[in-house]
């Protein structure tokens, strides 16, 4: 049986770091207010001439180097992003060109903060079907360009960055991507959206969010999806080494852990370092877990994210 395994992980954050105190100089907020409500202490902002594809390429290079896979052996590139360089062509094809992955086909997936889980599921199924052997899965965002920097309810929450993994065919029975479950509820699309769009008004717009309701759905849906994937695979929380949830708000992560009785030491937390990076959130957290010595070979990991749409998803992986 074919199964996709994560062979390499890479991440990239822009050079410009903006602390909460620096934000407080431009909008009515404070470090104490932001940390207490979100757990965020800082975020990174892309340079004016830096595109989503640029960050995606840097993360992908590190993931490829970590995996030992040659770029010419990559068959598929999937980029999860809601902030592509241009309306078209896809960010993924630009990444393919910059990386010189001449043998790959490439496309974008847009599920906002859930995008990386969706991209993982798609790449995993391409590998399982035998259509590809090696896939680059990337989450990359420049959220700073769709923020209203005068709106403290949203501008303090987001940052820019990219993360990537290399998935490769692996026949070992208990290793790799074991299970993924994807969900969406389009009736809730008005809870989190941008004020613009190509067809809507021809401009990118800025993020608009009903934060309280999104918060409630996040706790409910992330908790339920984790329970579902555990039950589907006859596993208990005790058997899982790490839970990597979308890094949107520390309180969401803590409340999901409390609801499911997950020990806090099993929750991977990186939001304090880079804020909510949307589709880049999960691979950035994975990279942090690996680089800090937490994540080890054979660890059983649950990845879970929720985003606008509303979309959400969960993935069970043996490293």
From Swiss-Prot:
It is an enzyme of class 2 (transferase). Pathway: Lipid metabolism; fatty acid biosynthesis. Residues 247-251 are annotated as: ACP-binding. It comes from the Bacteria. It is found in: Cytoplasm. Its EC number is 2.3.1.180. The active site is at residues 113, 246, 276. One of its GO terms (cellular component) is cytoplasm. Keywords: Acyltransferase, Cytoplasm, Fatty acid biosynthesis, Fatty acid metabolism, Lipid biosynthesis, Lipid metabolism, Multifunctional enzyme, Transferase. Coiled coil: none annotated. GO terms for molecular function: 3-oxoacyl-[acyl-carrier-protein] synthase activity; beta-ketoacyl-acyl-carrier-protein synthase III activity. It catalyses: malonyl-[ACP] + acetyl-CoA + H(+) = 3-oxobutanoyl-[ACP] + CO2 + CoA. One of its GO terms (biological process) is fatty acid biosynthetic process. Its main location: cytoplasm. NCBIfam families: fabH, PRK09352.1. Belongs to the thiolase-like superfamily. FabH family. Catalyzes the condensation reaction of fatty acid synthesis by the addition to an acyl acceptor of two carbons from malonyl-ACP. Catalyzes the first condensation reaction which initiates fatty acid synthesis and may therefore play a role in governing the total rate of fatty acid production. Possesses both acetoacetyl-ACP synthase and acetyl transacylase activities. Its substrate specificity determines the biosynthesis of branched-chain and/or straight-chain of fatty acids. The last Arg residue of the ACP-binding site is essential for the weak association between ACP/AcpP and FabH. Homodimer. This is Beta-ketoacyl-[acyl-carrier-protein] synthase III. It comes from Ehrlichia ruminantium (strain Gardel).
């Amino acid at each position: 049986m074919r199964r996709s395994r994560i062979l390499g992980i890479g991440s990239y954050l822009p050079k410009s770091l903006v602390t909460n105190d620096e934000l407080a100089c431009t909008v009515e907020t404070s470090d104490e207010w932001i940390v207490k409500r979100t757990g965020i202490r800082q975020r990174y902002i892309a340079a004016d001439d830096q595109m989503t594809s640029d960050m995606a390429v840097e993360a992908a290079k590190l993931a490829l180097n970590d995996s030992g896979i040659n770029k010419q052996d990559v068959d598929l590139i999937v980029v999860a992003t809601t902030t592509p360089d241009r309306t078209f062509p896809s960010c993924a094809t630009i990444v393919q060109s910059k990386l010189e992955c001449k043998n790959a086909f490439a496309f974008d997936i847009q599920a906002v903060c859930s995008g990386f889980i969706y991209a993982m599921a798609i790449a995993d199924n391409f590998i399982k079907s035998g259509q590809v052997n090696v896939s680059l899965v990337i989450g990359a965002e420049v959220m700073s360009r769709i923020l209203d920097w005068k709106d403290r309810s949203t501008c303090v929450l987001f940052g820019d960055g990219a993360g990537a993994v290399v998935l490769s065919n692996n026949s070992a029975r208990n290793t790799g991507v074991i299970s993924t479950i994807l969900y969406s509820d389009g009736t809730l699309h008005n809870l989190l959206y941008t004020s613009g769009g190509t067809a809507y008004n021809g401009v990118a717009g800025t993020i608009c969010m009903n934060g309280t309701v999104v918060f409630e759905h996040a706790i409910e849906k992330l908790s339920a999806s984790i329970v579902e994937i555990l039950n589907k695979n006859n596993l208990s929380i005790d058997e899982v080494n790490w839970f990597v949830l979308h890094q949107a708000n520390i309180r969401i992560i803590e409340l999901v852990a409390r609801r499911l009785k997950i020990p806090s030491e099993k929750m991977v937390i990186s939001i304090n370092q880079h804020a909510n990076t949307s589709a880049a959130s999960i691979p950035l957290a994975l990279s942090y877990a690996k680089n800090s010595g937490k994540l080890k070979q054979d660890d059983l990991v649950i990845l879970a994210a929720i985003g606008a749409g509303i979309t959400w998803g969960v993935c069970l992986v043996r490293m």
